[in-house]
């Protein structure tokens, strides 16, 4: 049985994610590392792109401890066939050759064949898709973002993840393998 992560939202709803260690082992380890230490708790979702995705954070949850990059999953595990990315999946964001974000996960709102093998699917939503579809429709406002060509809109009324509750089914998960060279993205710089 797979580990699960339950996102308890401030509005009382919850999103339950089944984590898929066999599909993206190091990515799952990194998510568990951040979630188990409470770094995702009391976090307002930072970016919503209707018709594309809900980005939970682009600042590593505002914690220096989460400001690290991990190797692309295909480099660590070329033998694993990556899963297709579509609504109902949970994917890890990344910064190209610099690596994947430690814990900057997102929910696709459409089929994303161009993401396959780049932004790994490391979980699937087993409860609470209605909450994700609700998030797609909330009122947003633009915010300044330091990466050219990337438009960022945040909810006008904060949509807060109160707490992430893990059920690791009695298993232990190691700390993630990190990139040897940490070329941190510009959207993290204002926090260092």
PLM regions: where:
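Cyclophilin-like peptidyl-prolyl cis-trans isomerases
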Residues: 1-192
